[in-house]
Amino acid sequence: MHACSIRDLKKEYVLKSETVRALRGVSFDVPEGDYVAIMGPSGSGKSTLLNLLGCLDQPSGGELLLGKDNVATMTDDQLAEIRSRRIGFVFQSYNLIQQLTVVENIQVPLYYQGKLGAKERKRCVDLAARVGLQDRLSHRPTQLSGGQQQRVAIARSLVNDPYFILADEATGNLDSKTTAEILSLFNELNAEGRTIIMVTHEDEVAERAKRIIRLRDGLLQSDRLNSPESRQAAAERALALIPDPQDDEEQTPTPIPVEA
């Protein structure tokens, strides 16, 4: 089964008297368990495709299936239902609620469904542990690093068992070390069978995915697989860029003794 299927997808906007064709007939499938990076320059249609995949907008033509649900024929209320229950969003800016704890932030999608029982809370605690935050359950976002906040966002994206995780520049605000950690977490989740669709402008981030789709001028420019060897090489290059803490220690200047 496919997590999503796109057939001749089109999106047009009317700006004053001009019609902008943001997507001109894009087609591809994302099988369950795939890990796809979507890339493209400004104006390629990447953001438009992201909005359609996230059920934030509807296509002007073509077909978009999320699982068995045809998004192209849905009402606004139906789209909202799909967004809240079947898509796991991970944003560049985390989008956490500052007044809530780690567990409460993970639980937000369930809150809107009225699912606030002990069973649901345990699931949120388990997801926090899955992303390495078992010792931060009662912390609020201001008490967490950027990487820890993104881990909360990833756990939140999993709470409804979505068709796929839709990650929009998820490492854009992170340093090289934390980026490597988050991408390793995505790899682990994908190895467990999770489907991940990641939008990025960074080649090194995209090379960690199983597959790279490139858009240009509203069309599918290329769709290629990454070999396991190239993915491993990208991971090793990323690790090589992480500063060694010992280097900082070695470069620390020796204090100059002050004469009495």
Task: Annotate each predicted stretch with a short phrase.
Residues 252-260:
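Long, low-complexity, intrinsically disordered segments
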Residues 219-246:
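Conserved beta-strand-loop-alpha-helix hinge in the C-terminal portion
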